[in-house]
């Protein structure tokens, strides 16, 4: 954001810094959510800088408490009760393609069921079991998250999609093991791509398209990729900003991006 605050663009410096970081041995994780697993300190090749958390030795990571409903405590075998607090803005949730794995796997929407773990350690929702139940406006009724918020002051207990971007382990306490991701290699790719676009009059070259697609591709199944990938015609500056919002949702960098794109105070 050098140009915003000093009046002097430093896109060449940005590109040079990104090129230096690319020499550091970092690599994109194979799956979009490997970066946010409970063992991301060991699993991820993408994380450059993170805040260390541990349920015993470095407490404070309470992602699920902020997003999940009270009923998830028993339904998901959690030792500490969620607060039913944060929800996703409906327009943002709708901005994801329906076959985008960041949407399919990264949010809770619809009827809520107990979550189980199979013999291979994979999570699944037990739709043969009794659905989780509401306890406020929908007391005793099936808990069904809807992509709708009545108002900022009168949200109902089932309002909004809930983010599960960070893995929530069964039996976890209110202090999760996931390290909080501050900066990852995919952001380096995005930063260089944006700098190249801005030096090219805001238009994407094939190099830029390939860079963004290298991050985006893991969020789609192979059979869906041909229609999902960007081209030099579809990757506009506005679409770049929108896709960066989806890729880095809830990671704390959106304000900086909106300021740089002169959209922080626009609707």
Which residue stretches match the model-derived regions?
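Extended, hydrophobic/aromatic-rich amphipathic alpha-helical segments that build helical scaffolds
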Residues: 1-22, 49, 100, 179-217, ...
């Amino acid at each position: 954001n050098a140009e915003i605050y000093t009046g002097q663009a430093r896109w060449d410096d940005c590109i040079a810094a990104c090129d230096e970081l690319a020499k550091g041995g970092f690599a994109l994780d194979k799956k979009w959510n490997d970066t946010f697993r409970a063992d991301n300190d060991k699993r991820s090749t993408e994380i450059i800088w993170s805040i260390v958390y541990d349920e015993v030795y470095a407490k404070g990571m309470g992602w699920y408490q902020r997003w999940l409903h009270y009923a998830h405590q028993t339904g998901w075998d959690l030792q500490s009760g969620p607060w039913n607090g944060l929800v996703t803005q409906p327009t943002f949730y709708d901005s994801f393609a329906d076959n985008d794995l960041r949407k399919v796997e990264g949010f809770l929407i619809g009827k809520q069921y107990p979550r189980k773990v199979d013999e291979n350690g994979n999570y699944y929702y037990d739709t043969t079991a009794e659905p989780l139940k509401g306890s406020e406006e929908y007391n005793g009724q099936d808990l069904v998250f809807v992509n709708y918020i009545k108002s900022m002051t009168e949200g109902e207990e089932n309002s909004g999609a809930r983010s599960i971007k960070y893995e929530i382990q069964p039996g976890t306490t209110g202090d999760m093991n996931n390290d909080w991701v501050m900066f990852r290699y995919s952001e380096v790719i995005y930063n260089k791509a944006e700098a190249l676009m801005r030096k090219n009059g805001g238009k994407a070259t094939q190099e830029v398209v390939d860079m963004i697609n290298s991050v985006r591709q893991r969020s789609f199944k192979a059979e869906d990729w041909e229609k999902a990938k960007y081209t030099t015609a579809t990757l506009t500056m506005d679409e770049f900003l929108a896709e960066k919002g989806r890729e880095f949702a809830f990671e704390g960098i959106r304000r900086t991006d909106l300021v740089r794109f002169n959209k922080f105070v626009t609707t």
